[in-house]
Design a protein with these regions (language model features):
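A short beta-turn/loop motif at secondary-structure boundaries
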Residues: 71-73, 127, 169
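Helical lid/core segments from catalytic subdomains that handle acyl or acyl-like groups
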Residues: 85-143
Length: 171
């Protein structure tokens, strides 16, 4: 989980970074419909978490964060995701260490989900790594846009993914 500080003096996006982290603080949301046909019989939520994490780990800009006020890039990321407690109708945020081998990741995901899905606390699994990003799903709601704003002084740089109910499109 190495974090590599970025030298702002040689950073090609220095001017843009300083503008948006300073005077032009903003957030943005982007909605992308994803064709999941190829997932076939795979369980949707863990498969999507794995695919998102693999993608985040391939794109350095998705691994950028501020640590103690220093801009840098993590070597790798792990998903922090929600599990729903059907009895209390609440969710908990847990995390699973990413494994590039889908079968190994799925086994770890299933262990963590089974262990923490009955929890009523917000974050029942301890030691969420700092190199994690958020994923959630509302499988009961079909939507084509969502907007999430964090009020933290504009320093949240890591991506947040929210998925909805799968739907058929274009035939």
């Amino acid at each position: 989980m190495a974090f590599h500080p970025i030298d702002l003096d040689s950073f090609p996006r220095r001017e843009h970074y300083l503008s948006f982290i300073g005077n032009n603080q903003c957030s943005y949301s982007m909605t992308v419909n994803v064709d999941i046909t190829a997932l076939g019989a795979h369980k949707l939520y863990p498969a999507m978490i794995w695919l998102l994490t693999r993608t985040v780990n391939e794109i350095p800009e998705f691994r950028m964060a501020l640590v103690d006020g220093v801009l840098g890039v993590y070597d790798d990321m792990h998903p922090a995701y929600t599990v729903f407690n059907k009895e209390s109708k609440t969710f908990s945020g847990i995390w699973t260490e990413f494994d590039p081998n889908y079968s190994a990741f799925l086994a770890a995901y299933e262990r963590d989900s089974a262990l923490y899905s009955a929890a009523v606390s917000y974050a029942p699994k301890p030691n969420t790594p700092p190199n994690s990003f958020n994923v959630s799903m509302m499988p009961w709601a079909t939507f084509t846009a969502v907007n999430l704003n964090l009020y933290n002084g504009g320093t949240a740089l890591l991506p947040i993914f929210t998925m909805g109910k799968a739907f058929f499109a274009d035939g």
